[in-house]
């Protein structure tokens, strides 16, 4: 979901005594935020090999200022063929129907600012926004080795095993 609570205590470091923050952040933002809070730099090498930079961004600034913009304006999702793209308050999603060609699936569009429960599909009202988000999802999917899509039947790993030589070079 897009509204998952997170409780953070920063001691007396919050000028307004805490409160609710509504900026979009993602689970990938937790490591950079924790490192930022404790003042530790991310390692750049391990065992002589480069360590990939974390995908997220620290959101410590929003802890001190409720009006700070999100440090994570967009995020793609994919799990077992279900897909989604979040960008600046908009969410495009498609829920996978088993044994249905991926090309026949219909994306939904939701305005998370006005409709955080995603109860109103606005795809017919804003088709250009759907096209924009689907295109952004496809770019992110290609850049992050999401293809080929599968339905959770592990076909992807049969075609590209996770233990192949390309992944062995990175420090884990």
Where are these regions (language model features)?
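Active-site-proximal N-terminal segment of extracellular/periplasmic enzymes that hydrolyze or transfer
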Residues: 120-128
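Active-site proximal loops enriched in glycine and acidic residues that flank catalytic Cys/His/Asp
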Residues: 8-10, 94-96, 126
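C-terminal cap/loop subdomain of S1 sulfatases and analogous C-terminal strand-loop tails that border
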Residues: 14-19, 23, 28-112, 143-147, ...
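A contiguous, mid-protein "functional segment" used to position or interact
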Residues: 127-151
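Extracellular/periplasmic ectodomains of large secreted or surface enzymes and adhesion receptors
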Residues: 131, 156-172
